[in-house]
Each structure stands twice: as structure tokens, then as C-alpha cells.
């Protein structure tokens, strides 16, 4: 039996029943790719967004983690379309985004803020952002089952 660490919890997982995939985004990510991933996580990424990477875990959590960077000027509109209450963001990782691994690096963020939102069908959306750089906002998205 293997152990998978997701969102700070150790989850037992049979090798056959749980599949983890992580990949760095290809150099040329199309707008169609971003739209598809956006639909999967419930967030409309702007055309200016750059996909940094995607990680999926199939199994008990059916988790997807996505890191995107977008121009700071596009952040307010993106946030207004997200299914979260912006006033609920709090400083720090708070156990919502899990450990750093490869492209996934919320613990290296200069000014990380996070929020958790309950979604229909027992799903959860954890959203974090780092606006510590003047012109770019890094967005960390984790969608998983409760």
C-alpha cells in the first residue's frame, strides 16, 4: 500500500486505485487548454494567463492542482469571477495547498493568501494567490473531494 500526501493529509491508496500524475505545462499552451482546465476547476482563466503546471491524483480525493500566472492588471477581474468571497482570503498557506513539489511552490510565495470554498457535489476549491511581484500574480488552485 502506498501513501499519497494531498492537502496536508496522508491518504492510504492502493496502487491500482490511485493514480498521480504531474506535468510541467508545455511551452505553447493554447487558450483551449486553459479553457478546458478552467472549466474543470470552475475558474475562467483570462487569455493572458500562463499555465505553469497541472497535477492530478485519481482516487479518494480526485484532486487537481493547477498553477497559473497572470498579469497583475487582470487579477481583479479574474477574482471577481471566482466562486469565492474575496474578503475571506487570509495570509499564509494554512494547510490548504499542500507541500511544494516541482512547479508547485506555494511555500516560496512572497505574499501568499488563501481561501477555501465548498462547492456542489461534495467538492472543495482551495485558492491561493501571490501578488508579491509587481506585474504578475501567481494563482494556486486545488479542487478535490471532501
Predicted region positions:
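Bacterial N-terminal signal peptides
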Residues: 2-12
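Bacterial signal peptide processing site
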Residues: 14-15, 19-20
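N-terminal "mature-domain start" segment
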Residues: 26-51, 96
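Short small/polar-residue motifs
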Residues: 45-53, 119-126
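Mature extracytoplasmic domains of secretory-pathway proteins
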Residues: 45-48, 54-110
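Extracytosolic low-complexity repeat regions of secreted or lipid-anchored proteins
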Residues: 84-143
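Active-site-adjacent structural elements in enzyme catalytic domains
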Residues: 146
Amino acid at each position: 500500500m502506498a501513501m499519497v500526501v494531498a492537502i496536508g493529509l496522508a491518504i492510504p491508496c492502493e496502487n491500482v486505485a490511485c493514480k498521480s500524475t504531474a506535468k510541467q505545462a508545455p511551452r505553447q499552451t493554447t487558450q483551449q487548454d486553459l479553457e478546458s482546465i478552467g472549466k474543470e476547476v470552475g475558474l475562467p482563466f483570462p487569455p493572458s494567463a500562463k499555465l505553469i503546471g497541472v497535477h492530478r491524483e485519481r482516487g479518494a480525493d480526485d484532486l487537481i492542482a493547477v498553477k497559473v500566472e497572470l498579469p497583475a492588471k487582470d487579477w481583479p477581474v479574474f477574482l471577481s469571477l471566482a466562486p469565492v468571497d474575496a474578503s475571506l482570503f487570509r495570509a499564509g498557506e494554512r494547510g490548504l495547498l499542500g507541500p511544494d513539489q516541482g512547479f508547485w511552490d506555494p511555500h516560496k510565495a512572497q505574499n501568499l493568501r488563501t481561501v477555501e470554498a465548498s462547492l456542489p457535489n461534495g467538492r472543495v476549491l482551495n485558492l491561493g494567490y501571490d501578488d508579491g511581484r509587481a506585474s504578475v500574480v501567481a494563482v494556486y488552485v486545488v479542487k478535490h473531494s471532501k
